[in-house]
Amino acid sequence: MPMSAETTSLPAALPIALDAAGGDHGVTPNVEGAVQAARAGVPVLLVGPRVALHAELGKHAGSASLPLTVVDAPDVIGMDEHASDVRSRSGASINVCTQLVKEGKAAAAVSMGHSGATMASALLTLGRLKGVDRPAILTHLPSKKGFVTLLDVGANADVKPVYLAQWARLATVYLQVVEGVQDPTVGLLSIGEEDHKGSQLVLAAHALLRELDGHSIHFYGNVEGRDILQGTTDIVVTDGFTGNVVLKLAEGEAKVLFGWVREALGSRLQTKIGALLVRGALRGLAERMDPSTYGASILLGVRGLTLIGHGSADARAVKNALLRASRAYEAKLIERLEAALTPQDG
């Protein structure tokens, strides 16, 4: 069935640290999304400029009684600044978020702000899981069978074959413990289904994934671009450059298609009447294809939960990101990943 962060709202033992001024629209959607998540039972630490956050909270009736706490961090790394700024700005809001996770005061760090800064902060503050050379950004796309998991979608443009094998293992555990997929299948993105097709990277990665098949992963084989949204496999692994292109292409195509549908249904009286009849179905389809339904992408491979959202995120996306972080924490994702990566004796 289609996955949605909105379907489950588990209370976390620890609050989620939200980079509450990050993103294109500042504190407004972040605070509104946090209020919605708090009403669903998820406690949130709002990390950012104290005065602005309290002023925004004041616009939401009843927010004072919700599990929301403001953590003052007036320094915010802007979308047009350098990711490397996290090294010299220890008090930046995203650094405060990841530090709270490291100290065990927050279950996860969530940011709709500078994605590069978020990745850099997570790596510098939390470090990598043992057995992981490079973390990857994992996201979900709607598919014919519900949703498909795609990684990497931007953390690593240049990769080695072993990275893809590691990411397949990480994504397998993620789907098992967070999304409840019992035996997720892994596909390797290539230009043909045949084992001998693909770049040198794909050929080498294919051999590694085949070795893991039946042990830590269920390897389907190569998949092509057309297979992704068909849901041929539960997981598709690729390098971050290709994955990011696939993600942006899918998002852009969805917008174009819905634009065409709106134009077609609104062009004549008969079609306007027909539009009223199919409005419910179209609304459900639009929700499945809306990135805000999935909230945020997870940075897999660091020693602490870190979720990265769109800079243009609205309140719904923020809420769903917080709910997803809560689910991952309750599922003990980091502990399960560490266990899966630990060599077994015998």
Swiss-Prot record:
Keywords: Cytoplasm, Lipid biosynthesis, Lipid metabolism, Phospholipid biosynthesis, Phospholipid metabolism, Transferase. It is found in: Cytoplasm. It catalyses: a fatty acyl-[ACP] + phosphate = an acyl phosphate + holo-[ACP]. Its EC number is 2.3.1.274. SUPFAM superfamilies: Isocitrate/Isopropylmalate dehydrogenase-like. GO terms for cellular component: cytoplasm. One of its GO terms (biological process) is fatty acid biosynthetic process. Gene3D superfamilies: Isopropylmalate Dehydrogenase. Pathway: Lipid metabolism; phospholipid metabolism. Catalyzes the reversible formation of acyl-phosphate (acyl-PO(4)) from acyl-[acyl-carrier-protein] (acyl-ACP). This enzyme utilizes acyl-ACP as fatty acyl donor, but not acyl-CoA. Belongs to the PlsX family. Homodimer. Probably interacts with PlsY. This is Phosphate acyltransferase.
